[in-house]
Amino acid sequence: MPTTGHVYGRSDNLSVQQTEGLIALLEGAEAALLFGSGMAAATSVFLALDRPTHVIASKVMYWGFRSWLREIGRYGHRVSFVETSDLKAVRDATLPGETGLFWIETPSNPLWTVTDISAVAEIAHGCSAVLCVDSTVATPILTRPLSLGADIVMHSATKYPNGHCDVVAGSLATARGGQLWDRIQKTRGHLGNAISGFDAWLLMRGMRTLDVRVRKQSQTAATLAARLVGQPAVSMVLYPGLEHHAGHEVALRQMIGGFGGMLSIRVKRGDEAAIAVAASVAIWKRATSFGGIESLIEHRASIEGESSPCPGDLLRLSVGLEDADDLYVDLERALALTV
């Protein structure tokens, strides 16, 4: 029985390895692994831990993963949800000898809070912990967390890397191998949560246009954010590229070439008005995902349910490749119905 090469598709295949190589190149990584979803990639990190540990995680993050983190006590892990943009709060939550993993999402979904990766890396490594960064929103085009001190970077490759809303995938990349990385790779094989060869091929197809898509989406998002500030029906615009955004200075340092294609707005008339806006647009698609070529709008609290910490008047906007003026006029018309 051969012990090298491509033996069984559940472990890997050539298409998967080629796409992993491209991800590693984009991230400046030593190695990368592809999974069947972003959740599969993220949860594999925790399942590969060799002992119960204390975890510090971003308070604001993708709700699906936050829900899973609240369940991992059965594995012996303890999670402290911290506002990771507040470095004092991060330091205060750190338990020397107990904290083994930091998990930060930046910019964080859906408030787009920005965490200083380099500063948190210093805190994490000061207590011999591993820093993992969910950089799905920034993409490797705008931020390379490994170059800022992160040990592992995670992406929901369903989003920007694929970019066409026809693949579900996730990725991990590491600055250096080691025992944890080896266990993650074994965990993927044991659980059978690797991506299929065909989906890896589709993902590679999407990644060929990643740079041009992300830069266009970032440019359009910045234009929309600036125009929505002061819009009569909008009480707040959340976007790291705006000077008044709390994380703008950090974003200037760590996001190179743009601030991403995601923004959120809060509607003055409240929850029902926000839902009405989402239902009244024509060009924006009402759907839950982001990073694709079509612009999407969603009432995030409705998606997350009653336990959601997301404000009920918030609409999350994923900017696609449509014309910025067309997108603004469509949104402005829907907002005008609530005034």
Model regions and ranges:
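A glycine-/small-polar-enriched, mobile loop at the entrance of the PLP active site in fold-type I
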Residues: M1-L25, E30
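Short, well-ordered beta-strand elements within core beta-sheets of diverse protein domains
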Residues: L203-V212, G260-K268, L315-G320
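Conserved PLP-enzyme active-site core in the AAT-like
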Residues: A31-A233, L238
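Conserved small-domain helix->loop->beta segment predominantly found in fold-type I
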Residues: A222-A282, A301-P309
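Positively charged, small/polar-rich N-terminal and surface patches that mediate targeting and assembly
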Residues: L14, M236, G291-I293, I297-R300
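A common structural junction motif
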Residues: L191, S280-G291, A334-V339
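PLP-dependent enzyme catalytic core of the Aspartate aminotransferase-like
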Residues: S80, R91-L95, R213, A279, ...
